[in-house]
Amino acid sequence: MVATKFTLKYSSNIGFATDQGGRGFQLPAHIAVRSDNRIFVASRGRGPTVGVQMVSRDFEFFGKIGSQGKATGQMIEPSAIAFDSVENLYVADEKLNRITRFDYEGEVIDSWGEAGSEPGQFDHPTGLLIRDEIVFVVDALNNRIQKYTTSGDFIDQWGGQGSSRDSLKYPWGITGAANGDIFVADWGNDRVIRFTEDGQFVSDIHKGQGAELPLNRPADVAVDQDDNLFVADWGNQVLQVFDENGNFLDMKRGEADLNPWALQYFESQQDEKRARSSYVPVFETNTDDVREVSARIEPFFWDPCSVALDENGSVYVLETCRHRFQIFDRV
């Protein structure tokens, strides 16, 4: 197969901070796009913002799944979301250490998991991948990947804390290639590792050939049909793109403008609108601190924590601290 050449062009962004519920997010942790291109965002924060918000890239808000709490179907810190072959939604909660399965309409089917370090237990599950009715769970603080049936029966695990080629240190995101291989964002080791679906090491990327920056605390990874990798590089506050051989292709820092939700908010808050229009960033700290720069330059990514692709290959980058995601289309 000949890989299709592309560049990424900024399209739009969706979201703004809210603690009132309804449209908007608070400290979102993960993003996924269903086959019909409906966008699902795991929103945390507190109270009415906790759950999985559903939106379209046309700024439609469809409501949310789940609510704050510990009962079945509720959430405290939803950390990862994924879909199976019949579009059931799976939600990992790193506070409750469990996985909950919802049907297409958002009704609870079942949940499973508990805190611990034994097989079948979790310590902060942060990533989900579902393939051929197998659920792969990134068990972050146990430094391992676990495999389950869709009903929650334990199958296998691999990993273990360390920096060797087949070890993990606080892994975060996960995705799958077309040939069955699996990519894991190995946050603590500043790399993305490629495994077979049985956990055998294939390769890794620390710094792609031609890249300006080595990976620094990668939070999540997505892969397209040509095995190009899209990495939410949390430590560098960028999106990095590599080909299947680890060659650097592109890097994005963020280009967001005010989206319609934010514009509508400012129309009702004229004092804030005037203050924003006259704001000039002042750096009183070391500007080599990329997070400090991100915090003060609104178009930039501020803590990019998750990345997803839709059926057309568009790229969605979720930012925890700006409570939004930016969309880039291929051209």
Name these PLM-found stretches.
Residues 1-331:
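Eukaryotic scaffold repeat domains enriched in small/polar residues
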